[in-house]
């Protein structure tokens, strides 16, 4: 109700150079979500967002609500998933019709020494990286990987040097942007599903035995 009141109150007051999105709400209740999606779709807005799925819900609940809700939003308008998420969340969101996302994960995790790679997330505070002279990820062209080793970045983090956090954030943002480029290329090529499965498998998001039996397990 609050969202509908907000949208109705904005008629003729919106800057024409900006886009107005309706936000689908309803927690994890599919019937409420679907009803609200239909109501905001009637307003013919610039785009539509799915909100309220990054405040404690499980990944399984998020994917269920997307499965139930997104089909009731206009297919020809951009769809935005708010406050999400991990690389796996983004891949699963795109597979369910989401076009774009916003999230603090890359920067927040980077500030704590957690960095993303194509083989999964690593914590540079772990002692095993103390003498690791490899870059965060082999072949990565981000500023951190081109010039610094895991060992040196870990030293910066342990010494509470701001550069350590900045390098981790730079790497994570580069990783996310590169993944989004790969997603767009896979969609254009018509092989997104196979790309997603391979990406999740390489990042350790799919259990090998479950995959072999046709069942997926997300962590």
Predicted feature locations:
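Context-gated lysine
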Residues: 1-2, 16, 38, 76-77, ...
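Glycine-rich phosphate/ribose-binding loops and adjacent secondary-structure elements
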Residues: 10, 15-136
